[in-house]
Amino acid sequence: MIIATSLRSQTFCTWRAWRAVHSTAVRLESKLNEVPIDRTRNIGIIAHIDAGKTTTTERMLYYSGKTKRIGNVDEGDTVTDYLPSERQRGITIQSAAISIPWNNHKINIIDTPGHADFTFEVTRSLRVLDGAVTILDGVAGVEAQTEKVWKQATSLNIPKIAYVNKMDRPGAGFSRTVMEIIEKLQTRVVLCNVPYFENSKDNDPVFCGVADILHVKLLKWNPEIDPHGKNITVIDIEAERDTYPEVYETVVKSRESMVETLGEFDEAIIDSFLESNEDYMNIPINVLNEAIRKATLENYLTPVYCGSSFRNIGVQPLMDGVVKYLPSPLQISVPEITSSATKNVKIKHVKAKQAVKQDMEVTTKMNNRTGLVVNANPNLTLALAFKVMTHATRGVMTFFRVYSGKLVSNSIITNTTTGKKLHVKKLFMMHGDEPEEVKHISSGNIGVITGHEDDIQTGDTLVSHSHLKKGFSEMESNLKLLPIEIPPPLFNSAIEPQTAGDEAYMKECVRILTREDPSLKVSVDEEMGQTIISGMGELHLDIVKERLVRDMKAKVTLRDVAVSYKETLLNPGSSYKQTSESGSVSIEIEMDSFEGAAEESSFFEENGAMIIAEDNNIIIIEPSAISQNMLKALEERRWKSTYSLEDLQEIVIQGCLTALQMGGPIFGLSLHSTVIRVKSWDFPVADSSVASTVLLDVSRSAVTSYIATNRDWFGILEPIMETRVYIDSDIMGEVSHDLTQRCQAVIKSIEDESTQDVDALAWAKDEAEKTFLPPDYTMKAGKDAISYKNKKIIIAETPLREMIGYLSRLRSITQGRGTFDMTYIGMRRAIKSRFDAISKEFNFM
């Protein structure tokens, strides 16, 4: 922190004049969609809820000239938060994409939600980002959701910049927050600027600017004179060192720390230091910038900025940091691309092990002018669909990221997930919820396709060829980018139409919502005649209700939110054989179960095993299961059925899947972690008159009959969470008792907040010692006073049901000082006492 006692008249230049000297270009010289790939940045704004993501994004839009006025969350007039629920609640629910010009670059920004219920929105956004701006609340520091999203980004090797926001708030601590960045996020840092304060008439520090460490300049904003923050006073600190001695001293020490950190990574810094007569301040800025950029791209360190977005202070330097230090699409890790010569199972959410074994090698090369080239084919376009939304006037809009080639309007694309060919008439770039039509979307950019209501879904791979007559090779027509994983839903709510006449529109609205948000699931309780909608949390389903009733005007009733339970087979029974009335179609099955992830189960190692990903089930069609009649028909070429062997196998799978979703014998809940083994099956392929629906019915009936015959061997599964409760040590006993008694928690450990990993803590302390941090006015003795000795983390495994409403109880116990977060770890078989408690929810006892 830097404090000046008064504002004296100084020699200064304006921000515009200073940037004309220190930047390559101030204004974008060409159309936004024509910006070269090396000057394109795809970034996400990530953080904990209420850290200021949307507020910062709105300032970026304003300062870039994209908007004429600043949108504010509190006033409900933001560009990126455009849903009525977002504007009313003041939170981000859907990720929003927008492109802006800045300093002769194009920045594609995705503003993501911060609430844990909308984690899937963050997950799918991270898949198409090249860099991220992590925003931290300067008062709260590194919060739980920040850690989670940071780890997600790190696992994807995404370089990051940190921005300490809300420096105008009482209790904001820049250095304290940077210490937490080092310790909790486990990253080195370089301070690109530090906060500057002036004392008010009451002798209170007032945040009014930042000291730029690289350029040795003091940047001052005056919200009273210029509330929009466009005019910035730029003061040469070195020339005015006598007027600002503390500012100069802080900048010098910060520069020294920066050089020392960079010197451990880049020998060019050491060479430049020696050439500069070992003067830290004489190292050329371009050398420092290049070293910071290289270190950031390799995730060696994180550049740190600070500001107050709401007060319009510090956002422009952050935008400069984005274009200087975050990667272009030319500098990212090549995405995982596969191509299978065999067709995968067509049923949605089915993964077949045998298809994985036949993947073909896909070659990739980065072209410095056009970007990634796949299969040595510059005419090939490869893109990933990562989001679908419904626009008020444009209809269905699919967001996609182009990884190679160029997608042009009025072209033909192939969805390699489904094999469908689609005609793309128009392409768009997005401005919040407003589309802007363009002729093409080139490699490294994010665009939108309209139409194709049911033809493209989240996670689908799209390919196109600029020479239609040549078409695709077999490899290219089967190219697939790594799909986007969809987490299992944890909460349910029954939804009912108010009248029979409202049912059709209700179903259409639900279909739209689930198309936009794949983390929403819909099932039907046949016994109760109810539609069940499942989501990630209570807030998630509250938003669904608001959108249905208020936005879509659907006349529906949503019941109270309940936890999503499942049923499973506890003990395997004998095999069961089902035959059609004519006797020509038959199937024999066995059922079993397992615990844990299907991919890790020994059942998945067997030939013919396929995972039904949605409920962690496995279907095994044994290679020997096909009947002798079918084999002979193949060998003797007497196959008259219009269905191929592959088609018939998929019908068997679909029949089994339908039965699993129809539910178990206890409460009719869908089955989970269950194995269906097809021992034998027969279909009269020599007779073209037999319909495939007979095989579908027989397959379904075999499973439902098995369940009915062995109903006493089924049990309940409930979702279990790893819960971390962050509290002061003096109330640890009371909180622990509440967790074990009222929440049925099993406490795994109680740790000091700073000692979860001894090696990580030792590294963080060593790194902090080498990093200069200016003293915080909120702390008496600077960084030496920072201590987490009185903070504890209780780590426990808890049934999700018992954590509903826990936050209000925790706040009551801790007087508002406690927080917690939860992570889903899997389904667990309910013991007798838990089974009895769950039964009461279904009015069964």
UniProtKB/Swiss-Prot annotation:
This is Ribosome-releasing factor 2, mitochondrial. GO terms for molecular function: GTP binding; GTPase activity. NCBIfam families: small_GTP (TIGR00231). Belongs to the TRAFAC class translation factor GTPase superfamily. Classic translation factor GTPase family. EF-G/EF-2 subfamily. SUPFAM superfamilies: EF-G C-terminal domain-like, P-loop containing nucleoside triphosphate hydrolases, Translation proteins. It holds the Pfam family EF-G_D2. It comes from the Eukaryota. It is found in: Mitochondrion. InterPro entries: EF-G-like_DII, EFG2, EFG_II, EFG_III, EFG_III/V, EFG_V, EFG_V-like, G_TR_CS. Keywords: GTP-binding, Mitochondrion, Nucleotide-binding, Protein biosynthesis, Transit peptide. One of its GO terms (biological process) is ribosome disassembly.
